UniProtKB/Swiss-Prot annotation:
Keyword tags: DNA-directed RNA polymerase, Nucleotidyltransferase, Transcription, Transferase
Catalytic activity: RNA(n) + a ribonucleoside 5'-triphosphate = RNA(n+1) + diphosphate
Entries under CDD domains matching the protein: RNA_pol_B_RPB2
Organism: Alcanivorax borkumensis (strain ATCC 700651 / DSM 11573 / NCIMB 13689 / SK2)
Domain of life: Bacteria
NCBIfam families the record matches: PRK00405.1, rpoB
General function of this protein: DNA-dependent RNA polymerase catalyzes the transcription of DNA into RNA using the four ribonucleoside triphosphates as substrates.
The protein's Enzyme Commission number: 2.7.7.6
Protein name per the record: DNA-directed RNA polymerase subunit beta
Family: Belongs to the RNA polymerase beta chain family.
Subunit annotation: The RNAP catalytic core consists of 2 alpha, 1 beta, 1 beta' and 1 omega subunit. When a sigma factor is associated with the core the holoenzyme is formed, which can initiate transcription.
Length: 1380
């Protein structure tokens, strides 16, 4: 088995027994793929598919003028190069975007001859900037990294549902159908309690559904024919005879004797059963004599027309009465049809609706619809027809989308999954005269009707045939990712442009305008900017640690535009659904109001072409599990029979047991092995990335696992990352895919390494033609993340190391040797200790603080802005009025703090003065100014100072100056340093290239003769020593005798010169970019950003947690010598409360502790072997015991492929503990942990006798001691501690503000007032309600008194009393206070 560069150095013992069938997919694919499809940047204009930007342009263009004489056509787009790269955009606070240029063709038609083209003008039009995605799936918008979260919304299509009996008091189920398009009006059909069908458009007032059918052009007769079967009645000699369909009689009660061959088959009043029907069928009766009473109450199916006069005798849907029957008889009608209905499965719903329908003609129906959509406007025929057409029948206003059409056709049981984006109706389109209508009619014909099919299905469901849909089913919800949402926004912008363009197009022909004059790109740019800047789904990236980044990008939210809202989402939407299996994690979701609405993608899930989530499964062919992987969506999965991943298998790949636990139709059940069609690919298929990092997840309660998943995302990167001793084996994937590490793009040999960059000389076979073959990786050093934590990369490679593509070469924050490392391994004991671990408190040892185990670095960015004010420009300077020398000691001559200065609260970081208006001077001041020439008093000090409670070191300063404003010395120094760094990179690249070329030339030239040059005589033979002694320039002066060699030498020289030229151009570009002025906001002259690094040690009040939802606050830090210790005198680091385990049911933490104890013990034993300098063979044997013998099952490791040096390096890295991987649902068993404990020389119980460090006495019983992975969470007491004496007040109520951010006070609320009232503490109460709150004069006096040492107070009127008076007056009641 092949190990990567970092895996070789430290192998995790893997307990997994199940075969690893499938590699973990790239974790950020959902973001990157979606946006790549949107931009299609890598394809030429001709190759682009109709999706993303291309689709948006094609849907809006061509734009024709109102007269039809001019049109704008679209001919492809291209992107320019972004001005700044990602890092520069973050520093400068700009958006990382590329300019979009679109080729537009203006076609002008000849007015006289129709269709002839008079003129064509083509031009590239600038359409604004489109933000680009960074390689890690984020966007840089105004200098901050943001993530666009994918949205899980209801798929377009048709859905059938009922109201669960909530609408009507009787609890009757009212069924409804809803057609949801991708864009356009919603169409609802619904039953009311009287069983009539109504239609609503866009949730407006309801109308009888038949109005819509009438508007489409259907007559009453046609409607009845479409929805009902009929009974044929013939009249012979005054006797009514009904054509017998025996099946229709089942379940009815006979109202007359039914005869067959003269015998009574069914007596009057009896219920007709299946036996009776069989008898009737046997008798072969075609017509049944029926009494006239039987027909009364039935309805006519077709209008009856007098053959002679052509008038309608009786309209269809008329109830038959004795009078109507007589009328028919008089008219000489011998046969007619009645509607066949019954109460069971053929309700009279549409017939009832038709009778409630007031309209008679299509025009009346259109007018009725117009009145409902536009109440109060007078309808005209054209307006009504237009409105109706624009609702559902035109591409511009209505689009089901391919997904919607597919779902629509599938739900209605049609064969074909494709079709038009509009709602099609054959009858309506046959009558349309416009071009679009004719095209659709030719394509689709006159048979199909979407609306009728929906109604039919709805009526069928009401009749008891068919079921309603489950809207929480993942087959009915789809994922909208970045690309799709950006496309929609872009289209919105284009539609706005279209409106403006149409107006101007009529001018185009007369005034000779070009496309650029017609198109204003502002609306497009504004729509895109609004989406990326302020959409609900464009979120500030959670950058606490690599895991929180990855999780944020894989998040799926049901909220956002077009989605649900928190308040309206019910319990069902939030709940775990069977279709979530393998698609959405059932564990990871926030606690609080968003629970269940924000989810995380499962590890292996992906979205298919339609946006539905799919999960991979292995196909089972002929009872054997194949290697073929098939992705199934939630709908496809229903009919499959899917075996669990841990089903027992035979050698040949078949199933061992006859009956296997499977999933079928979303239920867990047991089925025969022959029926199985698929099998899961991995045990962690069910859970998300964060949950798959929790070892022994299978032993934790779900609620605690949820907390564990969420709290890992809040872990602060520690100063030195420490890999978890007990992991799940997934840490490596997260670290690699998160993008915080430096991953080799191509293989090669490391040429140079320092703390800030790695240079790799690429393997020859990976170098493409005509490029340098040098990869330079600049590392990120001490940079601020979005959450103010520190991003820092440290190289792992040494000079001369060989790396392969995708190897990790440098660790990022919270990464240790290529593995995610969010916390530290702590030696924990589970025992009570003097009440210091009451209620989940945590007791830690001073050693943890001393060793800086949980010390973290936080970086704050402080910005000072110099603006142009009305009184004059603000100035950044060290010349600040009324400030002593000491305060200026840390500033340079430009007034900006030095890098490396240690500052604390109140120190000046950037000196700034603001001009203030001329003030009237007192005579004394005038005198002083006259004597000393003091000019400084016309400016005031507005310097940027360090805020309260902050103490740290300045690590970086950035200065941005507006174009045209002279740069200060500091800005020039910063620019110089940046250019120097760039120059250094170029030099190194050139040096390696040169060495590489000379090395190849050397191989060719050794032993060859030269015809002089470089001071050599003709015929001199070149040896290795001579060549090694030559400078690079001298090489190219040589004149080899061999023509081939001479040609190679010349080619090499040209190549190097060309490369040098390219480098010079790159340097010039960089120089222009750096030294040019900056594009700052309006009125801003200069911006100085100061970065302050703060070191935070762990302290009481900080929140810590394990990975199992076991969180707590540090109560006290005890001296090392007072902590409980074992027989060797080794104290524990952390003492946890054992009572935190049983009730919380997260036993995983105990198993982790035991396994950690074994891991550490094994490391210590390896350490002893190294210290005793045991033979390498012995170390190999012991390692083999650990990896391949202890804990029988696990994955074997190929230690024989390691050289002796590699074994020693591995052993040295294992001294701190042998890392273990216990994968989710496939982890270590109890007996394996016991075996390892034994191998490590510990007791199998995992418990140890401890002694009290203070008294030296042994505790009464043994204590569970081991190693647990603890995290420090980003809820630090430093950020929460806050105190106020006086400060700012609210404007209206004059009460102190609240919260640390506003430097607010403690609210003494209603209940606290009750408490004081209950104790009768009148004076305290008075003080609280007046001088400490909103008695403006009183509080000023008290403050003055306290300063003077006088502790009296005289309370006055609280301001809130005046507010109350004003409120009463605003009600129109005059109220005045009387003065005593």
């Amino acid at each position: 088995m092949a190990y990567s560069f970092t895996e070789k150095k430290r192998i995790r013992k893997d307990f997994g027994k199940l075969p690893k069938v499938m590699e973990v997919p790239y974790l950020l694919a959902i973001q990157l793929d979606s946006y790549r499809k949107f931009l299609q940047q890598d394809k030429s204009a001709e190759e682009r598919l109709e999706e993303g930007l291309e689709a948006a342009f094609r849907s809006v263009f061509p734009i024709a003028s109102y007269s039809g004489n001019a049109a704008l056509e679209y001919a492809g787009y291209e992107f320019g190069k972004p001005v700044f790269d990602v890092k520069e955009c973050i520093i400068r606070g700009t958006t990382y975007a590329a300019p979009l240029r679109v080729r537009i063709r203006l076609v002008i038609y000849d007015r006289e001859s129709s269709g002839a083209i008079k003129d064509i003008r083509e031009q590239q039009v600038y359409m604004g900037e489109i933000p680009l995605m960074t390689e890690n799936g984020t966007f840089v918008i105004n200098g901050t990294e943001r993530v666009i979260v994918s949205q899980l919304h209801r798929s377009p299509g048709v859905f059938f549902d009922h109201d669960k009996g909530k609408t009507h008091s009787s609890g009757k189920l009212l069924y409804s159908a809803r057609v949801i398009p991708y864009r356009g009006s919603w169409l609802d059909f619904e039953f009311d309690p009287k069983d009539q069908v109504f239609v609503r458009i866009d949730r407006r007032r309801k109308l009888p559904a038949t109005i819509l059918l009438r508007a489409l052009g259907y007559t009453s007769d046609e409607v009845l024919e479409m929805f009902f079967d009929t009974n044929e009645i013939a009249v012979e000699d005054g006797i009514y005879r009904m054509k017998l369909v025996p099946e229709r009689l089942r379940g009815e009660t006979a109202t007359f004797d039914i005869l067959a061959d003269g015998e009574v088959v069914v007596e009057r009043g009896r219920r007709i059963t299946a036996r009776h029907i069989r008898q009737l069928e046997k008798a072969n009766i075609e017509y049944l004599d029926i009494p006239a009473e039987y027909l009364q109450g039935k309805y006519l199916a077709k209008s009856i027309i007098d053959q002679d006069t052509g008038e309608i005798l009786v309209e269809c849907n008329t109830e038959l009465t004795a009078e109507t029957l007589e009328k028919l008889e008089q008219g000489g009608i011998t046969d007619f049809e009645t509607l066949y209905t019954n109460d069971l499965d053929n309700g009279p719903f549409m017939a009832d609706t038709l009778r409630a329908d007031p309209t008679r003609t299509p025009l009346e129906a259109l007018v009725e619809i117009y009145r409902m959509m536009r109440p109060g406007e007078p309808p005209t025929k054209e307006a009504a027809e237009n409105l109706f057409k624009n609702l559902f029948f035109t591409d511009e206003r209505y689009d089901l989308s391919t997904v919607g059409r597919m779902k629509f056709n599938r739900r209605l049981g049609r064969e074909d999954e494709t079709g038009p984006g509009i709602l099609y109706d054959g009858r309506y389109f046959s009558a349309r005269s416009d071009e679009e209508g004719k095209q659709y009619f030719e394509q689709m014909g006159g048979e199909t009707s979407d609306i009728i099919d929906v109604l039919r299905t709805l009526v069928d469901i009401r009749n008891g045939n068919g079921v309603v849909d489950d809207i929480d089913h993942l087959g009915n919800r789809r994922v909208r990712s970045v690309g799709e949402m950006a496309e929609n926004q872009f289209r919105v912008g284009l539609v706005r442009v279209e409106r403006a363009v149409k107006e101007r197009l009529s001018l185009a022909e007369s005034e000779g305008l070009m496309p650029q004059d017609l198109i204003n790109s502002k609306p497009v740019a504004a729509a895109v900017k609004e989406f990326f800047g302020s959409s609900q789904l464009s979120q500030f990236m959670d950058q606490n640690n690599p895991l929180s980044e990855i999780t944020h990008k894989r998040r799926v939210s049901a909220l956002g535009p077009g989605g649900l809202t928190r308040e309206r989402a019910g319990f069902e939407v939030r709940d775990v659904h069977p279709t979530h299996y393998g698609r959405v994690c059932p564990i990871e979701t926030p606690e609080g109001p968003n629970i269940g609405l924000i989810n995380s993608l499962a590890t292996y899930a992906r979205a298919n072409e339609y946006g539905f989530l799919e999960s991979p499964y292995l196909k089972v062919i002929d009872g054997k599990v194949s290697e073929e992987i098939e992705y199934l969506s939630a709908i496809e999965e229903a009919e499959c029979v899917i075996a669990q991943v841990d089903a027992k298998m035979t050698e040949e790949g078949g199933f061992e047991e006859d009956f296997v636990t499977v999933r079928h139709r979303y239920e867990f059940t047991v089925m025969e092995r022959d029926t199985i069609t698929h099998m899961d690919v991995s045990p962690r298929q069910v859970v998300s990335v964060a949950a798959s990092l929790i070892p022994f997840l299978e032993h934790d309660d779900a609620n605690r696992a949820l907390m564990g998943s969420n709290m890992q995302r809040q872990a602060v990167p520690t100063l030195r990352a420490d890999k978890p001793l007990v992991g799940t084996g997934f840490e490596r994937h997260v670290a690699r895919d998160s993008g915080v590490c430096v991953v080799a793009t191509r293989g090669g040999i490391v040429d140079k390494v320092d703390a800030s960059r790695i240079i790799v000389k690429v393997n020859d076979d990976e170098v493409s033609e005509g490029e340098a073959g040098v990869d330079i990786y600049n590392l990120t050093k001490y940079t601020r993340s979005n959450q103010n934590t520190c991003i820092n990369q440290r190289p792992l490679v040494k000079v001369g190391d060989r790396v392969a593509a995708r190897d990790i070469m440098a660790d990022g924050p919270s990464v240790d040797m290529g593995e995610l490392a969010l916390g530290q391994n702590m030696r924990v004991a589970f025992m009570p200790w003097n009440g210091y671990n009451f209620e989940d408190s945590i007791l830690i040892s001073e050693k943890v603080v001393k060793d800086d185990r949980f010390t973290s670095i936080h970086i704050q960015e402080l910005t000072c802005i110099a603006r142009d004010t009305k009184l004059g420009p603000e100035e950044i300077t060290a010349d600040i009025p009324n400030v002593g020398e000491a305060a200026l000691s840390k500033l340079d001559e430009s007034g900006i703090v030095y890098i490396g200065a240690e500052v604390e609260a109140g120190d000046i970081l950037v000196g700034k003065v603001t001009p203030k208006g001329e003030t009237q001077l007192t005579p004394e001041e005038k005198l002083l100014r006259a004597i000393f020439g003091e000019k400084a008093s016309d400016v005031k000090d507005t310097s940027q100072r360090v805020s309260s409670g902050v103490k740290g070191t300045i690590i970086d300063v950035q200065v941005f100056t507006r174009d045209g404003v002279e740069k200060d010395e500091r800005a020039r120094q910063i620019e110089q340093a940046a250019l120097e760094q760039f120059r250094k990179d170029l030099k190194d690249e050139y040096r390696i290239l040169e060495l590489d070329i000379l090395e190849r030339l050397r191989a060719v030239m050794v032993g060859k003769k030269v015809n002089g040059g470089a001071g050599f005589k003709r015929g001199t033979e070149m040896t290795g020593e001579i060549l090694d002694g030559l400078d690079a320039e001298k090489w190219f002066e040589l004149r080899p005798a061999d023509d081939d060699v001479a040609e190679q030498l010349e080619r090499a020289q040209q190549y190097l010169e060309q490369h040098k030229k390219e480098q010079d151009e790159r340097y010039k570009d960089k120089q222009a970019k750096i030294s040019g002025g900056d594009d700052l906001a309006h009125g801003v002259l200069k911006v100085v950003k100061v970065y302050l690094a703060i070191k935070r040690r762990i302290q009481p009040g900080d929140k810590m947690a394990g990975r199992h939802g076991n969180k707590g606050v540090i109560s006290v830090i005890m001296p090392e010598e007072d902590m409980p210790h074992d027989e060797n005198g080794v104290p524990v680091d952390v003492v946890l409360n054992p009572l935190g385990v049983p009730s919380r049911m997260n036993v995983g933490q105990i198993l982790e502790t035991h396994l950690g104890w074994a891991a550490k013990g094994l490391g210590e034993r390896i350490g002893e072997m190294l210290a005793e300098q045991k033979k390498i063979a012995d170390i190999r044997v012991f390692l083999d015991k650990i990896y391949n013998q202890a804990g029988a099952g696990g994955t074997p490791e190929d230690l024989d492929s390691f050289s002796d040096d590699e074994i020693i390096e591995l052993a040295k890295n294992l001294v701190g503990g042998v890392p273990m991987a216990t994968a989710v649902f496939d982890g270590a068993k109890e007996f394996e942990i016991k075996e390892l404990l034994e191998l490590a020389g510990h007791d199998r119980s995992g418990q140890v006798q401890l002694w009290d460090g203070r008294t030296g006495e042994a505790f009464d019983r043994k204590v569970t001691v081991g190693y647990m992975y603890m995290l420090k969470l980003n809820h630090l007491v430093d950020d929460k501690m806050h105190a106020r004496s006086t400060g700012s007040y609210s404007l209206v109520t004059q009460q102190p503000l609240g919260g640390k951010a506003q430097f607010g006070g403690q609210r003494f609320g209603e209940m606290e007032v009750w408490a004081l009232e209950a104790y009768g503490a009148a004076y305290t109460l008075q003080e609280m309600l007046t001088v400490k709150s909103d008695d403006v004069n009183g509080r000023t006096r008290v403050y003055k008194n306290i300063v003077d040492g006088d502790h009296r107070m005289d309370p006055g009127m609280p301001e809130s009393f005046n507010v109350l008076l004003k409120e009463i007056r605003s009600l129109g009641i005059n109220i005045e206070l009387e003065n005593d």
